[in-house]
Structures are given as structure tokens and as C-alpha cells.
């Protein structure tokens, strides 16, 4: 089995592509006619599986597809062979490739080899600490670069798919999600619940699953070769190991490196320890952040400026909450992520009288800082010169080159980390100076544009505006752009669209003059397998039902009938969708017509909407103790505890004078002071997926049956992206 193919330079394009794809995504050359691509012979992909009575690990040498498997269990002890193998990897300067191997697989493997662990239960306990332990416990178990037996390349870190946010519920992107994104034939999850004591037959099955995961990781590895090469080159250039850095972290480190060369100090020595330099502010006067040349003629924009200038804040969160300006019927929303405004459910078309024009600020936030000498206070004004040097270094590399991309990340790291409590760039006043002025300066351009007779604003976003301009005033708008550039010392880049199809600010299609489409939000459908440089559907994004935006595009751009397009669409994978449930939840397939009979599914599955399936349901545990009253909002812990104690001690057996329906599972009566007004109780929560439609699990692609696809669902969803735009008069 080979994993990387290369097109013939004569009959094809000569480029590399993953061998699991049927055709070259660049030129369409069939895979069977291509040659094997070159893979670094140092790279060995591996993955471990751990249960209370068994440990398995699978290695595959990617370049040759040579495979090894090892087991430590009550029936078999491969520890001596595993130790020898790992030491051979060390001796030949091998590199271990994995998915979350730095955070999990390697720390377990390292301790097994170094401590000669042959007790599967002890190995399992170690693994559980890495999965469920506290931050301190996990940190203590990490193995740093200098101590590793062989180098590690972790793809989850390269792509920054390990990010999580407990507040928003964002979880790391799992390997299973990537299997769906890469369109693997068989998407598999752990075959047995964590903690199960496995039989011999189950252990044999575990080995097969272990190999499946390694192959899936290799598939993702060959799709990551450009990112890996960039990190290897930058590591050599800067003398620092960037191999497992995300783009953001890599950019921050490059910026620090370049500025330190210019004499900028990012760290102090305190008690012989290196301590980050930061600017921590108890409060920020926003009036001091706004540039003195920000002035408005329109009272709506001036009211926003005046309100912001009058504020002194103690935290940046919520500064712009509810802040907007309605100007000539278009609402401009201000936020920490930038300004946003857009017409909705409209189609615009350039014609003999009007032209759609889009202007964006080149490297907006970096140049805003450079031209206005903005910097974190602790870094000093000298930082501005060094930062500008990084900008010019980026400009020296061609667009699309790895170096250009790396220095772009370095430039973005300044603002991106300025509100990060763990960063050497921390200064929230700098953060607010950038985001406040960025939005207000764009509004200054907007208010001059809307004076022009017949000009209509279409959109405003973080770094630019789009407008529908009478052709006789195009040169006048360019003069206004030149005036704005001279005022701000920034540069605007113009693009012209022939048509725009707009659902809202987050979802639209823009057709460039001369061809080419810009697809945003609900209309995006280009996958990274089709174009590695796309930002439409990256590997970490849910690729569900791509036939829907494709049909909408065909209808809007080409006038194709939606149902005709969908029923004749040849790519079966475009009908497939992804369902995902957190590990604490259950995902079940239920059949209401059979007394709600149900079967448990994996926590992430692939499915399609069918005429013959069941109902897909997520089942979540209660957010509190089952059957107890839900706590009202804004009730302090002290108040809640005091009232609860009062209710508990005042109860009479069995329920005092309260009606049985007014007490919860613990016998606590409902009290308006601390409980929700609607007397809701904590219970099992159910959320339907594709409610009202039947679905069929096709995690194994063999279960996809085109004859059972319910085209009505896909047609209906595509119509939601098309019909609202057609009911509004077009321009």
C-alpha cells in the first residue's frame, strides 16, 4: 500500500497528492497511472490503545508500509521486543508521527520503555491520568523534547486541532472527524467502552482497530506535508524547533525572534528566573485610545464615537455589547472582532449603470499599529521599528510562498496575543486601540461614500467595505479612497464583482469580474482535498451535506434547477453528513414505530437523510442532580446555600405541608428565591439531529444506498439558501 502519489510531469501536472484519492485534485489524472511520491524515510506513524488488561501499539514505516505490532497483556508480553524496537528507532534517528502523540501516546510509550512496565493495569492507570487528570498531573507526565528517545511530530498540534474551550463547549478535533473529512471508506470509533476488560477475541479486534487508526493518521500526514515542510525549513532558518507549533504559536515565536535581534526585551530576570514582561492595566480610558483625527459628520457614527470615548473600562469583554448604528437603513454592529454590516437576502449585479466594488485594507491591524506607532507599553516605541521590519521582510517574499505565510502569522501575533494573559505581548490598551480605531476609521470611509448619489452600501466587515456604485462616480469613490489612505497612511486594495448573492453578513457568494467565486459561510463547499489552500471547508470543519451549497450555487450563479442538480449529482459523499456528541453524551438511532427501540452509536458518525432509516438523537446527562430543582439565574452561592439550608431543616416528614409535586427528588420544596420560575428540574436532555427526517448510518460507506436517499431534504435545505434571495428585488 502506498500513501503518496505523484502525477507524471508529461501526462499530468507533476504534483503530489494522497494515494487514497482516486484522481489528482490538481489536474484529474487517475491515481492508478501515477507514481509513488517521496516520503521522509525517517517517519514512522504509530498509535497506542490502552485497556485495563491490555496495551497495544502499532507502527507503520510510511515510506515502505512495513508494519509492526506489540502487545502487553496477560496472554502476551512483548515488552522486550518493544524496547528493542524503540531503541532502534532512537539509533536510526527516526521520527514518530501521530495524532495527539505528544500529549498522550508518547508519554505512555516512554514510561513503558524506560520503567519497563509490563503490568497492563498500571499502564491503563497511567493513561487515565493523562486523559482525566488535573492540569498539574498532565503537565507532570509530559516528556520534553530533550528527554525523548526519538523525535515526535504531532499533527494535532501542527493544525491546532487540540484547542478546546469549556465555556463554549468547543472540543478538540478528533481523528474520527478527520476520517469523515478525508472521506475514508470506514469511519471507526473505539470498538469497546473505555475501562472494559477485554476477552482474547476482543483483543484481536483491538489490534485491527489500532491499525485502522494508524492508517487514518498516515492519510492525514500526507495531507500535512506542506505544513510539515514549512516548519522544517523555519526550524533551520531560526534555529528553533517549530515542528509541533501551530501557525499562531509559530508566528508569535518568529516575531519575538526578529524583535530580539533588534534589541527588544521580552523577559526580565527575577530571582534568577526568566519572567515575561507585560502591561497589566486596572482600567483603560477608551478616550485615550481613539485617534484624534477620528471625526464624523453623521450623527449616528458620532454618537458611537462619543459613547466609546466617554468610557473607562476594567475589562475588555462586553465593551461593544449591543452597540450599533443605523445609517440610511443599514445597521453597523461594533464588536471586539471588528465591525459588521450587511444587506440581507439580496442579489446585486454589475451592469451598464452600476459596478459592485470591494475595498480591503492591506494588512489592516499590523499597519494600523505600524503607521500610528502603537505598541504594548512595556515593549517601548523601539518595538514599532522592529515590527515594521517584519512587515517589510514579509513583503520581500512572493504571495503564496511559505515564508510569506509565516511572516503574516508573525505580524498577526502582535494584536492576536495582546489580550492574552500568558503572552509577552499583553497590553489590553493596545488591543482596544487597534479594534476601536479599526472600526471607526472604516466608518469614516463609509460616511463619505454614502454621500454619493445612487451609491448603496452592501457590506462592511473587519477590514473593508463593499458598495454598489453608479459608474459615473467610480473615479470619485477612488478619490475618496485616496483621501482616506492619505489620512490614515493605510493602503486600500480594490476588487470588482460582477454579481453578489447575499443571505447575510456571514453567508454570501461574490463573483469576480473575469471569473472566480468567493464563497462564505453557508455557501462554502470547496474542501482542502480539492484545494489545499482553501479556507472554505478545512479539515477541522463539519463537511455535512455539501450537495446543498453546491446546488444553491448552481441555482444562483448558473440558473440550474435545484432538484435537477441534486438528483443528478454524482458524488455520493456530498450527501453524507456528520453527527457528533460529546463523550459525556450518547448518540442513538431510534425507531419510533417500534416502541422507540434504539441502538447506541459511536459518538461521531456519518449518515445521510434517507427514506428508510431511523431518528438520530443525542442524549445528554442532566446539568445537575437528576430530578432536583434548577437554580435561578443570578443567585449567588451564598444565597443559594442559605435558603437551601433553611428549606432542608424546615422539612416535615415526608414533605411537610407542601404538595408532593412541589418538591424535588431530594424532597426540597420549590422556593421562588432560588429556583426557576417555571419550576423546572434537572433531567435527561434529548436533542434530535435532522428532526422530522429519517437518517441512515453510513459510517461504513458500504451502507450508503443511493436508491434510499431522501432528495426532498436536500432540496428543501438548498431552497433555504436560494428562495429568500429571489423574493427580494435584485439590483
Name each model feature, range by range.
Residues 3, 164-165, 169-170, 181-189, ...:
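Conserved "right-hand" nucleotidyltransferase catalytic core of DNA-directed polymerases
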Residues 4-5, 28-36:
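Short Cys/His-rich micro-motifs in 6-15 aa windows
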Residues 6, 12, 23, 178:
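The −1 position to Zn-ligating cysteines in a subset of zinc-ribbon hairpins
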Residues 8-17, 28:
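Cys/His-coordinated zinc-binding microdomains
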Residues 20-30:
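Cysteine-rich micro-motifs
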Residues 67-176:
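Conserved DEDDh/DEDDy metal-dependent 3′-5′ exonuclease domain
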Residues 156, 169-171, 190-196, 324-447, ...:
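Helical catalytic core of nucleic-acid polymerases
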Residues 324, 474-731:
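C-terminal, non-catalytic extensions of nucleic-acid polymerases
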